[in-house]
Amino acid sequence: MASPAGTHSLPSYLDPNHLGPWGVYLQQVDRVTPYLGSLARWVETLKRPKRALIVDVPIEMDNGTIAHFEGYRVQHNLSRGPGKGGVRFHQDVTLSEVMALSAWMSIKNAAVNVPYGGAKGGIRVDPKKLSRSELERLTRRYTSEIGIIIGPSKDIPAPDVNTNAQVMAWMMDTYSQNVGATSTGVVTGKPVDLGGSLGRVEATGRGVFTVGCEAARLTGMAIEGARVAVQGFGNVGGTAGKLFAEAGAKVVAVQDHTGSIHNAKGLDVPALLAHVQQTGGVGGFAGADAMANDEFWGVACDILIPAALESQITQDNAGKIQAKMVIEGANGPTTPEADDILHDKGVLVVPDVIANAGGVTVSYFEWVQDFSSFFWTEEEINARLVRIMKEAFAGVWQVAQDNKVSLRTATFIVACKRMLHAREMRGLYP
């Protein structure tokens, strides 16, 4: 039976009650719809990905067997420009997760006003169980499979969980071999020698630090002496922790996959970073006391930075949080239920879609540099990153004040209006 005129037939996996990250995203869009004015008539376009590609990724293993892995590339919204978003290799990757991450990339790119739409990719695999040659074959096969929808003017992948500059180099080379010409701009996060940008590795953490300082300034919190707790101590959490420590804050607790550590007087961050580099995690660091993982969330601190995976702050642990401010370095680390709890507690949440946009901002710089074949100094890159992040945060802060809403809702209002205005101006074709 056909749907009545004016209604939308919604596939089951797009239902707002859908469990998982995509359901979280749909709830977030529903929260901002009342603030969109006449643009709300287009809001349904934000609740559906433009396209979702599921691919089989078969590779020959080192022992001669053939293994099959499931891969994804989702393009959520391309109204403002080509798709942009990372590729993650993780055993728990799902379509719901990749769809949500692509949508959050749409929001993030629009929030900082870089000319991209949102996209995301992933392979359901534990890369730690692969040899280097198996990882390379997996990357190249996946790149070939999604090659029909990526390109420097179509969709530009980047590193994410368990992917790095080497993986991006393999992706760039595979795409280039397939099209018959070197195309450095097809991915970002590449090695500098292959058209990568200076400052890219630290960019997300630097963005977290920048908006954190702006939020602290606007709320009257002094960074000097502030106690900081960080979950995840890789490129994002490690860089943010280092910059906060250099600004006079005390990093008092850190958690990662190897355990949780605490030192109320402040951790020696350079020594901890060296320990992580040598051992692969914070566990066993001599300059701190070990603590139970569930105790990490209740540690006495002023600023909490979740910089690991999504859905880490939930209704089960949000009530324990003592921080005055949460700066989301990870994508989607706070569930909607936890968001409400933190709001009721008076905790300021600086959301992922603005806080961790430093990475995609410098990816944009890399893309621009690749097209022009003219490269900037690290000082130029960092200065431009800080300017864009400060301007974007100031705009979001003003919308939050004007509408008396959270920073997350304000970021979504800014981003959704930009995307839907672009969609309205472009119209529908045919």
Residue ranges, per PLM feature:
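Adenosine-phosphate binding glycine-rich loop
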Residues: S12-G20, L36, A215-A216, G319-P430
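N-terminal ligand-binding/catalytic initiation module
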Residues: M1-L198, H421
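Buried hydrophobic packing segments
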Residues: V98-L101, M171, V208-A216, A240, ...
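Conserved active-site and cofactor/substrate-binding residues in soluble primary-metabolism enzymes
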Residues: G20, V24-Q27, V93-S96, L130-R141, ...
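Rossmann-like adenosine-cofactor binding region
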Residues: G259-V349
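General beta-strand structural signal in soluble alpha/beta enzymes
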Residues: A100, I156-A158, A181-V187, V230, ...
